């Protein structure tokens, strides 16, 4: 059982989603926000599944592009995220996540392939195979030590309604082309209209909630960065807490207490970054040597 403590907002990494139909300005808006979040353009990476759309805005700055082509299996997205992390990126733009869901080799195709294998067709059991694969993709986004901006295509959503006994199809808004509920995983979710104006659909930061539509800029990213850094700095908190580590059990609890600082190494293990590992190792050796004396 965990110990009861006062609520305290930690410094965080943003998880921001941009949704719009084709031509809504998702890539451009994502790059501007990313620049506000990053210390420089070369600390931004775009995982590009949109046939080179990220390169269209190279005049903005010297950002990095990792092109991802079919098949769009979730694991390929995960590997791309880890590659960007290991390269020292501060912001990762995933443009877009739609292909992970509905693209060639994506989740919908994986599900259909599972159904096709069955003698007695059962879509429910096929989803039991797909859901864990998709969840690993979500976890890679949520657990990343980088700020992450996702773009997703949206389309007009319709539903059948009964109007005095007559069936009719009515437009009910826009639907994101990804698994239902993805936006609930995010810190902030913005819908872009045809004029590239953003409307907030979800905002845990309360920075934009209730505001009129606005055009995302570099300043938008700077505002978000300031919010992220206004909480308790977990890295500094961990380093300060090392002086209180006097038993092996104290060191064993660090990964649980500071789970947000963990990264995924090339072997797929969740570990602290190298600088923190060195600090922890040095303190552990200091404690061990003291006990031997």
Language-model regions: role of each:
Residues 94-130:
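Conserved P-loop NTPase nucleotide-binding/switch module
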Residues 21, 131-221:
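Phosphate-binding/switch region of NTP-binding enzymes
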Residues 29:
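Hydrophobic positions on the alpha1 helix immediately C-terminal to the Walker A/P-loop
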Residues 1-20, 24-26, 35, 51-54, ...:
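Interfaces that engage single-stranded nucleic acids at replication/repair/recombination sites
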Residues 37, 41-91, 117-120:
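Nucleotide-state-sensitive switch-loop elements of NTP-binding domains
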Residues 9-11, 35-40, 83-87, 140-144, ...:
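Conserved catalytic network of the ASCE P-loop NTPase/AAA+ motor domain
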Residues 54-57, 100-108, 157-163, 197-201:
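Switch/connector loops and helix/strand junctions flanking conserved nucleotide-binding motifs
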Residues 15-17, 43, 91-93, 147-149:
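Residue-level preference for the first positions of well-ordered beta-strands
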């Amino acid at each position: 059982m965990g110990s009861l403590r006062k609520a305290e907002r930690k410094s965080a990494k943003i998880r921001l989603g941009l949704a719009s139909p084709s031509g809504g300005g998702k890539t451009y808006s994502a790059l501007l926000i990313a620049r506000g979040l990053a210390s420089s353009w070369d600390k931004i990476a775009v995982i590009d599944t949109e046939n080179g759309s990220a390169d269209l805005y190279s005049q903005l700055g010297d950002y990095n592009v990792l092109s991802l082509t079919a098949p769009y299996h979730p694991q390929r997205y995960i590997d791309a995220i880890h590659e960007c992390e290991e390269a020292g990126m501060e912001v990762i733009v995933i443009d877009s996540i739609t292909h992970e869901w509905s693209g060639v080799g994506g989740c919908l195709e994986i599900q259909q392939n599972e159904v096709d294998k069955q003698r007695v067709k059962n879509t429910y059991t096929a989803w039991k195979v797909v859901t864990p694969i998709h969840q690993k993709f979500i976890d890679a986004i949520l657990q990343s030590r980088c700020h992450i901006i996702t773009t997703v295509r949206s389309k007009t959503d319709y539903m059948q309604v009964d109007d005095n006994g007559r069936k009719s199809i009515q437009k009910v808004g826009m639907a994101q082309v990804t698994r239902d509920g993805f936006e609930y995983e995010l810190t902030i979710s913005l819908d872009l209209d045809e004029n590239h104006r953003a409307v907030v659909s979800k905002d845990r930061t309360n920075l934009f909630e209730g505001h009129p539509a606005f055009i995302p800029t570099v300043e938008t990213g700077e505002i978000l960065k300031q919010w992220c850094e206004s909480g308790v700095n977990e890295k500094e908190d961990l380093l300060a807490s090392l002086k209180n580590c006097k038993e092996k059990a104290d060191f064993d609890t660090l990964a649980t207490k500071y789970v947000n600082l963990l990264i995924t190494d090339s072997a797929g293990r969740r570990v602290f970054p190298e600088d923190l590992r060195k600090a922890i190792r040095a303190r552990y050796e200091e404690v061990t040597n003291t006990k031997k004396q």
